[in-house]
Amino acid sequence: MKNRVYMLGIIIWLAQINYVNAANKIVVMNVANIFQQSAQRTEIIKQLEYEFKDRAAELEMMEHDLQTKMQTLQRDGATMTASDRNTLEKSLIAQRELFSNKAKLFQQENHARQTEERDKILDMIYKIVKNIAKKENYDIVIDTNAVVYFSSHIKDITDSVSNQMRVK
């Protein structure tokens, strides 16, 4: 009987030790914070602005031209001949449709490029996290945005990941 109580005490003690060790192998990080502060993100923003600069300028010119024609139609429409007014209206409709199509295509391509570049940065972050986790023997790495609460004894590796992002 004494041996059973003694063995039960040892089993409970070992279970508590494993629980404490498991908590030490769980870490958190803030992916959004790392992403927002990365130098790569700043570079990508500048690169994409440069890449789409000419098309954005073209769309601005088209929009300005459309507004000018619409103002002309509103201002002089009553005094124009019917054929001139009809021609201007058809021109406006065609130009507005062309502008709309170009703007939609621009937005789609810009969004696709932003997504592509964002995914590259996130992939870089995840590779760094994986390397840190392997090096430090962490079992689980959790994004702080996916957790409602975590105790202060859980290690946060956000700064370590951010520092390695600066090096790359």
From Swiss-Prot:
Q: What InterPro entries does UniProt report for this protein, alphabetically?
A: Chaperone_Skp, Skp_dom_sf
Cellular component GO terms, alphabetical: cytosol; periplasmic space
The alphabetical list of record keywords is: Chaperone, Periplasm, Signal
Recorded GO MF terms: unfolded protein binding
The protein's location, in the record's own words, is:
Periplasm
SUPFAM superfamilies tied to this protein: OmpH-like
Please give a single GO biological process term from the UniProt record.
Answer: protein stabilization
UniProt keyword Signal present: yes
Q: Which Pfam families match?
A: OmpH
Report the function annotation for this chain: Molecular chaperone that interacts specifically with outer membrane proteins, thus maintaining the solubility of early folding intermediates during passage through the periplasm.
Quaternary structure (record): Homotrimer.
Its recorded name reads Chaperone protein Skp
Which organism does this record belong to?
A: Blochmanniella floridana
Q: What is the lineage of its organism?
A: Bacteria, Pseudomonadati, Pseudomonadota, Gammaproteobacteria, Enterobacterales
Which gene specifies this protein's sequence?
skp
